[in-house]
Regions:
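A ligand-binding cleft/hinge motif common to bilobed small-molecule-binding domains
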Residues: 109-120, 241-257
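N-terminal export signals
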Residues: 2-4, 9-30
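C-terminal segment of N-terminal export signals and the immediately downstream linker at the start
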Residues: 25-45
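Extracytoplasmic substrate-binding proteins
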Residues: 38-44, 113-197, 214-220, 239, ...
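Short secondary-structure boundary segments
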Residues: 49, 107-108, 130, 221, ...
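A short, structured surface patch at a secondary-structure boundary
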Residues: 44-98, 102-114, 253, 262
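His/Asp/Glu-enriched short active-site or ligand-binding loop at hydrolase and phosphoryl-transfer sites
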Residues: 199-225, 244
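Short helices/loops that flank or line small-molecule/ion binding pockets
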Residues: 92-99, 228-236
């Protein structure tokens, strides 16, 4: 923790030094952009996370969107919005060029110096904590509803999601549901452009498995790790969970089973493979309760 805090303080110091070094032309440009934003009759929002973008569309507030990050691929209309890059590697110039009245993001967004530049230019940056809990979903709905003036729609969506969430909890605690000791051992495998990875504790995949009442076959591992045959064979997963994007990248289910050690598992012998849209499964957005319901059914 102390190392993380040291890195964070270092980034904050860097942000301050960078802001102090801004040239007069940059400051003048930023002030001009801020003046144009103040005359905008409706919100001009940039959404930097798929879950926030989905929430904006669910509330019917897509007319307020002027840009999204590259994780925002659902609904399909979001793919046609102006893109500001990946959420962890944002550019102040690219964001400010869209003249946003606010930027919505999770606390995973960055780098910190860019967020500081946006605030210095007069653009409010709203960050939602990523705690990997259902509360994250509701916090995103409430923030979007407030910023877009869709409070009534927001309250309705919160009520709907809470009802879905209660159904998930009821299923997880049902006498018909196996106890944790008897729950299936599930291994999450992801390959979105590089080598295949598996997920241990403190990951969104681990959180979703716990919420669904399953056991993470790699719960003794911290974070994401490269898939390797030894750990897979030792874990002996009953089920492999992946994303549809991973299947597409690897070339289908047959190619996935050929990954390190997977062919030697109970999951491969019984061909128990589940695949979901990546951001629906891992993004903690408004699709989360329905995905958990599907996951529970398919694991039963």
């Amino acid at each position: 923790m102390s190392g993380w805090m040291t890195r964070r303080h270092g980034l904050q110091a860097l942000a301050g030094a960078t802001l102090a070094a801004w040239s007069t032309p940059w400051s003048a440009w930023a002030q001009g952009a801020a003046a144009e934003r103040r005359t905008s009759p409706t919100p001009r929002l940039v959404s930097v996370h798929s879950s926030l973008t989905e929430t904006i569309y669910r509330l019917g507030a897509q007319d307020t969107l002027v840009g999204t990050d590259t994780t925002s691929t659902f609904p399909e209309a979001a793919q046609r919005t102006r893109k500001v890059g990946y959420m962890r590697t944002l550019s102040a110039e690219g964001l400010l060029a869209l003249q946003p009245t606010a930027v919505l993001a999770t606390d995973e967004a960055g780098p910190p110096v860019v967020l500081a530049q946006l605030r210095q230019a007069g653009v409010p940056v709203h960050l939602v904590p990523s705690t990997l809990r259902f509360d994250d979903v509701l916090a995103k709905v409430r923030l979007v509803a407030q910023l877009t003036g869709r409070e009534a729609q927001g309250r309705a969506l919160v009520a709907q999601l809470q009802a879905e969430w209660h159904a998930v909890q009821a299923q997880a605690t049902s006498p018909a549901t196996p106890s944790r000791a008897g729950a299936p051992r599930v291994m999450f495998v992801m390959a979105h452009g590089g080598g295949a990875m598996t997920a241990g504790r403190d990951t969104s995949a681990h959180a979703m498995l716990q919420l669904a009442g399953a056991r993470n076959a790699l719960e003794q591992v911290q974070g994401f790790r490269a898939l390797n045959a030894e750990s897979v064979v030792l874990a002996q997963p009953d089920v492999v969970l992946t994303t549809t994007e991973s299947l597409a990248f690897l070339g289908g289910a047959e190619r996935l089973w050929q990954q390190a050690g997977l062919s030697q598992t109970p999951a491969a012998r019984h061909q128990r493979l589940l695949a979901f849209d990546g951001m629906a499964l891992l993004g903690f957005g408004p699709r989360m309760p329905s995905v958990l319901t599907q996951l529970q059914r398919q694991l039963a």
